[in-house]
């Protein structure tokens, strides 16, 4: 006799949807605060501060039954993935500006800090006796006993720091001099080049 395995295009898309489960949950949280302090009695001197925090949590559960076209013969395929990230930023600047006679000066002295952290994990298994509630009992698949299940997890963290100075001098609205200095450091830089 003769038979062939149908291409994906030969399958009913509605049936394909019914033979898989996709569950996703996401939580986002963010907050920021900015504050400015006028430093008296020095006129024109201000201290600015900004801080922000962002956090994200994401979970995805996926299951394709034994009748899903691409997983036929595998008795169902399940996977679970989790992701957690947060980002903290802080920036502080001291600003001074003043005008006297024909002279005008503006200066900024600043510091910036950022830290990003991420945690990631995933697991997959197949070979289930039933299609009910598989993503909540992923260890029930037979592939884990055969050493064929998959799992991984890792955590990463990166830090960025910067110091900067800007000075601008203007005389009589005709002559302008500007000087900027900046130094950056990051954990992403090479081992012997953390600052630049």
Describe the predicted segments one by one.
Residues 108, 171-172:
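Short, well-ordered loop/turn elements at secondary-structure boundaries
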Residues 1-39, 142-166, 170, 176, ...:
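Outer-membrane beta-barrel transmembrane strand signature
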Residues 26-30, 34-129, 187, 191-193:
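Small-side-chain secondary-structure face that scaffolds active or pore-lining regions
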Residues 1-15, 61-78, 119-150:
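Surface-exposed loop/turn segments flanking beta-strands in extracellular/periplasmic regions
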Residues 178-189:
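Transmembrane beta-strand segments that form the barrel wall of outer-membrane beta-barrel proteins
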């Amino acid at each position: 006799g003769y038979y062939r395995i149908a291409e994906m295009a030969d399958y009913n898309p509605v049936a394909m949807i019914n033979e898989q489960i996709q569950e996703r949950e996401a939580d986002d949280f963010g907050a920021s605060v900015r504050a400015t302090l006028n430093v008296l009695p020095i006129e024109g001197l201000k201290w600015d501060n900004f801080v922000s925090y962002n956090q994200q949590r994401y979970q995805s559960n996926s299951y394709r039954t034994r009748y899903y076209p691409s997983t036929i013969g595998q008795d169902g395929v399940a996977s679970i993935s989790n992701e957690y990230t947060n980002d903290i930023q802080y920036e502080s600047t001291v600003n001074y500006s003043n005008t006297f006679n024909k002279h005008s000066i503006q200066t900024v002295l600043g510091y910036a800090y950022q830290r990003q952290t991420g945690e990631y994990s995933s697991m997959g298994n197949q070979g289930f006796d039933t299609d009910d509630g598989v993503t909540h009992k992923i260890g029930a698949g037979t592939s884990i006993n055969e050493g064929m299940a998959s799992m991984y997890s890792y955590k990463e963290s990166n830090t960025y720091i910067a110091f900067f100075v800007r000075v601008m001098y203007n005389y009589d609205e005709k002559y302008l001099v500007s000087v900027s200095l900046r130094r950056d450091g990051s954990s992403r830089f090479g081992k012997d080049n953390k600052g630049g």
